[in-house]
From Swiss-Prot:
Gene3D superfamilies: 1.10.10.410, GatB domain, N-terminal subdomain
Keyword Cytoplasm: no
Name of the protein this chain belongs to: Aspartyl/glutamyl-tRNA(Asn/Gln) amidotransferase subunit B
Cited NCBIfam families: gatB (TIGR00133), PRK05477.1-2 (NF004012), PRK05477.1-4 (NF004014)
Enzyme class: ligase
Assigned keywords, A-Z: ATP-binding, Ligase, Nucleotide-binding, Protein biosynthesis
GO terms of biological process kind: glutaminyl-tRNAGln biosynthesis via transamidation; translation
HAMAP family: GatB
Alphabetized InterPro entries for the sequence: Asn/Gln-tRNA_amidoTrfase_suB/E, Asn/Gln-tRNA_Trfase_suB/E_cat, Asn/Gln_amidotransferase, Asn/Gln_tRNA_amidoTrase-B-like, GatB, GatB_C_1, GatB_Yqey_C_2, Gln-tRNA_amidoTrfase_suB_CS
Self-association and partners: Heterotrimer of A, B and C subunits.
GN (gene name): gatB
Functional summary from the UniProt entry: Allows the formation of correctly charged Asn-tRNA(Asn) or Gln-tRNA(Gln) through the transamidation of misacylated Asp-tRNA(Asn) or Glu-tRNA(Gln) in organisms which lack either or both of asparaginyl-tRNA or glutaminyl-tRNA synthetases. The reaction takes place in the presence of glutamine and ATP through an activated phospho-Asp-tRNA(Asn) or phospho-Glu-tRNA(Gln).
Any GO molecular function: asparaginyl-tRNA synthase (glutamine-hydrolyzing) activity
Organism: Treponema pallidum (strain Nichols)
Catalyses which reaction(s): L-glutamyl-tRNA(Gln) + L-glutamine + ATP + H2O = L-glutaminyl-tRNA(Gln) + L-glutamate + ADP + phosphate + H(+); L-aspartyl-tRNA(Asn) + L-glutamine + ATP + H2O = L-asparaginyl-tRNA(Asn) + L-glutamate + ADP + phosphate + 2 H(+)
């Protein structure tokens, strides 16, 4: 399928000359760099706690502040999570990799350099399949590399015209996931970020908190233009530090149109302009990208091996062991839930929102007679409680097997759906089993036809006027009589069987 899109010169540049109104074709080219904070207990190269929030500059030490004489020590947990991320994204894990210093001067980078990996990254040659709601086809996106690096501090620009720096984030462990330029629309770029977040949160290497910057995306955008038999490319712009899917989608959409407009207004870029990569920021208020600076060349960063850190040497056995911990990924689990358990696409998508939720559901489904009934109950009732209490499902005062028992009682028609809701509330409050509550309160649904028929006859005997009304054509009496039978059974009678027996008895009058 072709990724070329069509446009006309006047629609882009506002031209009025009809000679410029010929159609042209263009292809959007996007590659993403995703920075992901890892869920380690400590920072990457020191023993400071790796937590968000807290008092500014309360979790720092000589190592993350870059004080003279302080030596970094790489965290094994950091490397382990990096390897697991690489395995989940289909990468080859390099048994040898090395750390480098990337030099640049920002106020929030106290060492004057960032510890990263330059030409010897931990992971290479991966790929993920991206499929969004608004994407017509699935796209395979190649991952060029994943490397380890540390985060910088945070600059806070206050209303008093001063800038303040919080170094708590200095040294927080990151991986940078670099894709090949395989994305062909802003929608695909947003879906790629979403897919990466879904996979990495599912295997629990990151919490993926977008608001706190645990996952940030830089998008490299340019356009290939075919016009009157000639091919042109616009210079690459890198849009930095986007922390939401909408931001990625909106920024890339705008940048593509901006580059097309610039091309028609100024003509093809010179060789010098093509070599200069522009760094852009996204202004969500104005809805525009803004030039921040012209990108440094690699030479400007003065990469060098970090003499304070030894090279990383991994064994095949170590990598093999970690591969077992990755487990089944969300896409595969969704497909299995739909194929084997008959779940809808929506149910499968929601229930694979986290590994904890997927595991919890699967335990309940295996213990129950009807996996779809269990899935629907979790989606409608269980998650409502989880969200209301702002807890994870593991903190719920119920086991998966307890929900399975409750659903089987509905499946076997021992209780109604309405009764199940009341019993569920009692289970949450007391921790009691569904069967114990049903037995103690005499809630078991009455399904025996002879017993229900006896109730019907009793109601008929008590309400002869209703029977005469029925004989005179008042058909709504049937519903009223059903209600009386249900009332006499204290709601325990099976509604469908009550309806059948009432209509049978009325037809014999």
């Amino acid at each position: 399928m072709s990724d070329l899109q069509t446009g006309t010169v006047p629609s882009i540049a506002g031209a009025t000359d009809d000679t410029h109104a010929a159609p042209f074709f263009y292809e959007v080219i996007i590659g993403c760099e995703i920075h992901c904070q890892l869920l380690t207990k400590t920072k990457a190269f020191c023993a400071c706690a790796n937590r968000s929030g807290g008092m500014p500059n309360s979790r720092v030490c000589p190592v993350c502040l870059g004080l003279p004489g302080a030596l970094p020590v790489v965290s094994e947990e950091y490397v382990r999570l990096g390897v697991r991320a690489g395995l989940a994204l289909g990468c080859t894990i390099q048994l040898w990799s090395a750390f480098d210093r990337k030099h640049y001067f920002y106020p929030d980078l106290p060492k004057g350099y960032q510890i990263t990996q330059y030409d010897a990254p931990l992971c290479t040659d991966g790929a993920v399949d991206v499929q969004g709601v608004d994407m017509p086809v699935q796209r395979r996106v190649r991952i060029e590399r994943i490397h380890l690096e540390e985060d910088a501090g945070k600059s806070l620009h206050a209303a008093d015209a001063y800038s303040y720096i919080d170094f708590n984030r200095c040294g927080v462990p990151l991986i940078e996931i670099v894709s090949r330029p395989d994305l062909r629309s802003a929608e695909e770029a947003a879906c790629f970020m979403q897919t990466i977040r879904e996979i990495l949160t599912f295997i629990e290497v990151t919490d993926g908190n977008l608001e706190e910057g645990a996952l940030r995306c830089d998008a490299n955008v340019n356009v290939r233009i075919l016009y009157k038999g000639q091919e042109h490319h616009t210079p690459i712009s890198e849009i930095k530090n986007m922390n939401s899917y909408r931001m990625v989608r909106d920024a890339c959409t705008y940048e593509v149109q901006r580059q097309l407009q610039e091309f028609w207004q100024k003509g093809p870029a010179s060789k010098e302009e093509m070599q200069r990569k522009r760094t852009m920021g996204w202004d969500p208020v104005e809805g525009v990208t803004l030039l921040q600076r012209t990108k440094h060349s690699l030479r400007d960063y003065r990469f060098m091996r970090d003499p304070d850190l030894p090279d990383l040497h991994l064994t095949p056995a170590y990598v093999q062991h970690l591969s077992y911990t990755v487990g089944e990924l969300p896409a595969a689990r969704r497909a299995r839930f739909k194929l084997d358990l008959g779940l809808s696409a929506f149910a499968a998508q929601t229930l694979t929102g986290s590994r904890m939720l997927a595991d919890w559901f699967e335990k309940a489904a295996h213990a129950s007679k009807n996996a779809r009934r269990v899935a629907n109950w979790i989606l409608s009732e269980v998650l409502a409680v989880v969200n209301e209490k702002n807890i994870c499902i593991a903190e719920l005062n119920l086991s998966p097997e307890a929900i399975a028992e409750l659903m089987d009682a509905v499946e076997d028609q021992r209780i109604t759906g309405k009764q199940a809701k009341d019993i569920f509330a009692q289970m949450l409050a007391t921790g009691a089993r569904a069967q114990d509550i049903i037995s103690a309160q005499g809630l078991a649904q009455l399904s025996d036809e002879e017993e229900i028929a006896t109730l019907v006859q009793t109601v008929f005997q008590e309400h002869p006027k209703a029977l005469r009304d029925w004989q005179h054509g008042k058909t709504n009496v049937a519903a009223w009589l059903m209600g009386q039978v249900m009332k006499r059974s204290r709601g325990r009678a099976h509604p469908a069987r009550v309806a059948t027996l009432v209509h049978q008895a009325l037809s014999q009058l």
